[in-house]
């Protein structure tokens, strides 16, 4: 499934509208999507009313230095893992003061996959505190662009569902 530009725009607009109605702010912590979620959210005029910031933490060093992800989590579980995306959410919340954060770390390809984490494996987390954080793993098919597009769409939809439950 290829998430089109229009689908991404519509999902970003729906989340933006929901954040405005809920009077909530958001921050992003992205690895394999390279800031694409933040880009989609800020494409909309008025997004400064709900987007506080975005951090692209592609390397493990950036995850540690900017988000406070522990070396232990990275060593024991790898960057593409539930503990790491949970720590990325906590770090983004702490760094920005946002009400909600979303984190993404995955293997977009074409290389970099392993038996345990093949290309297309992407971990997501979103939440407003460590206790409320939800983590989900998805396995997407397609080339690098398709994996990243599907990841952005899934993240936008997942966060909207989270906000709807608040």
Tell what function each PLM region has.
Residues 1-166:
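Short alpha-helical segments enriched in small residues
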